């Protein structure tokens, strides 16, 4: 394995999705495909930070300063926030978002539309920004 150096370090973000359950806490993990890096391992959702993840308008309820403070980084925390939301949606269909500052309530037609948007995103036919703009949802 090559030693870490400034030029080979990639920004990445991972999230632990945890919820209360009558039998105890539940932790959400995904199984990686049998090919590529870390085949067949169970991991937390996440991945590399894309250039498009640095878009403050995707998070109107959170500033970079606030995100950075919550994540314990000096600056640029908002790009990790956006990256983790995008990766969760891409990898497992979990949409970490809000609408007008509250929980997102989707009817069946909206769920189907967002599901189709996810397929378009995975096929490279739609950007993450477009998914959010079409659904009127914010991270």
Question: At which residue positions do the language-model features occur?
Answer:
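The catalytic Nudix box helix
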Residues: 44-46, 52-134
């Amino acid at each position: 394995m090559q030693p870490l150096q400034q030029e080979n370090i990639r920004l990445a973000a991972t999230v632990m999705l945890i919820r209360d359950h009558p039998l105890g806490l539940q932790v959400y993990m995904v199984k990686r495909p049998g090919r590529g890096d870390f085949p067949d391992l169970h991991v937390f959702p996440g991945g590399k930070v894309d250039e498009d993840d640095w878009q403050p308008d995707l998070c109107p309820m959170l500033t970079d300063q606030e995100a950075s403070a919550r994540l314990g980084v000096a600056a640029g925390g908002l790009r990790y926030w956006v990256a983790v939301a995008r990766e969760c949606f891409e990898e497992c269909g979990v949409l970490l978002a809000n609408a007008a500052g509250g929980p997102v309530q989707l009817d069946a037609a909206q769920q189907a539309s967002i599901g189709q948007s996810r397929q378009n995103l995975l096929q490279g036919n739609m950007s993450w920004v477009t998914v959010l703009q079409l659904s009127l949802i914010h991270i």
